[in-house]
Design a protein with these regions (language model features):
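Sec/Tat signal peptide C-region and signal peptidase I cleavage site
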Residues: 3-7
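Subset of outer-membrane beta-barrel
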Residues: 8-401
Length: 401
């Protein structure tokens, strides 16, 4: 029998579900996408960087340079059968730049969080095997993986674009466990290091001037890992034993094939609608977590954006209004219960330059993850994404009168 209480963390996430696998998939997005249900496979990169589909980089206007930096704040309310607890996390969320190579191609580089870890299990009471004695453990985890990504898009012919991307995934997941057994205190620090490459492709096709379809696929890959471990044991506050190990091999972590299909539509002037579906084939990785199994994941998203004028002469005509919805079936099943989540989003694009070519993007997401059942908890989360998206023209000639 064990009892668990959750405490506050100050990492990029405070989700207790970041305990599983490599952590929770990051809520970070570049530019407008977080307000559009985290979707946009068929959207271009003509105004802002769209990191979801490498083919979009072919839409960057000639001689243009795009830059984006973001910040993410998160409030989580975790509920189980005994209590509710609030957690706050905030951090840098992305850095990206993109530019046109020529009038038919563009490329970009970005770094964004890939997974986030930030959990704390406080006061885990367990029995010493073979006796009536109890011991208490406190376990905390932090860190996550980053995605350093290079995108390239090329327009094969008018209305049809292809793209390729390469990601270098890397990062550290740290866990600390403190165990108290009578007068003996055990402290265990483990740092798990992962890295690996991943490759993907995409295309976009303009059916006409109102409808575009987008497609992406990311190939399955393996992330190699090593572990450093440092253990200290004290008795009556006196250090009695110390163990320091480094470079220990750990199991590789498999990432699945991911397939995405999106539709973009412009039904009326100023309105853009995006709808995406993604399928991540976790079941094919044939791997398990300590307390669950991986299952295929489906992600649905829909978003809409309205702007009064393409190039408005008045300031308010360049403001962009956005809203979206996202449903994620989850990829981990615990006690035959899949940990799914959903979220609603709203946002604004606030012009900070003439004609609205550069924007301050602000979005708010509200959603739920998991259910109160057995060892599972329900997590209600609120996210605020703030992105500064800048656009400029390279090699512009300056004329003097």
């Amino acid at each position: 029998m064990s009892t668990v209480a959750y405490s506050q963390t100050n990492n990029l996430t405070g989700s207790p579900y970041s305990l599983f696998g490599l952590g929770v998939q990051s809520n970070s997005n570049i530019g407008r996408n977080s307000a559009l249900g985290n979707g946009g496979l068929a959207l271009g990169s003509d105004r802002m960087i769209n990191n979801l589909n490498p083919a979009s980089f072919a839409t960057i206007p000639k001689s243009s340079f795009l830059f984006d930096i973001g910040f993410l704040g998160e409030l989580n309310t975790v509920s189980n059968n005994n209590r509710d607890e609030n957690r706050i996390a905030a951090n840098f969320s992305n850095l990206a730049l993109a530019f046109s190579v020529n009038d038919k191609s563009g490329m970009g580089i970005s770094i964004v969080p890939f997974t986030d870890v930030g959990y704390a299990l406080i006061g885990i009471e367990s029995n010493v095997e073979g006796s009536q004695d109890n011991f208490v453990s406190n376990i905390t985890g932090s860190g996550g993986l980053n995605d350093l990504r290079l995108n390239y898009g090329y327009q094969l012919y008018d209305g049809f674009r292809i793209g390729v991307r390469t990601s270098f995934l890397f990062g550290t997941i740290a866990e600390n466990e403190q165990v108290l057994i009578g007068d003996t205190f055990l402290n265990i620090d483990e740092d798990n290091f992962y890295n690996g490459f991943r490759f993907g492709v995409g295309f976009q096709y303009d059916i006409n001037n109102k409808y575009t379809i987008g497609f992406t696929t990311d190939l399955p890959t393996r992330l190699d890992g090593t572990k450093d471990r440092f253990i200290t044991k004290t008795l009556d506050a006196i250090l009695t034993e110390e163990v320091n190990e480094s470079g220990l091999d750990i199991n590789t972590f498999k990432l699945p094939m991911e397939i995405g299909l999106g539709i973009g539509a412009k039904p009326i002037s100023g309105l853009t609608v995006n709808m995406d579906y993604k399928r991540n084939l976790w079941g094919n990785t044939d791997q398990r977590d300590n307390i669950g199994q991986f299952t295929d994941q489906s992600i649905f998203s829909i978003g809409a954006q309205y702007r009064a004028r393409e190039i408005g002469l008045k300031y308010w005509q360049n403001i962009e209004f956005r809203a979206g919805f996202n449903y994620d079936s989850g990829y981990l099943k615990v006690n035959n219960q899949t940990i799914d989540n959903y979220s609603f989003s709203v946002g604004l694009g606030i012009p900070i330059s003439n004609r609205g070519s550069s924007m301050l993007n602000i979005s708010y997401n509200s959603g739920r993850r998991g259910v109160v059942e057995g060892i599972l908890v329900e997590e209600n989360f609120s996210l605020i994404n703030i992105n500064l998206s800048l656009k400029d023209i390279w090699f512009r000639k300056i004329k003097f009168n």
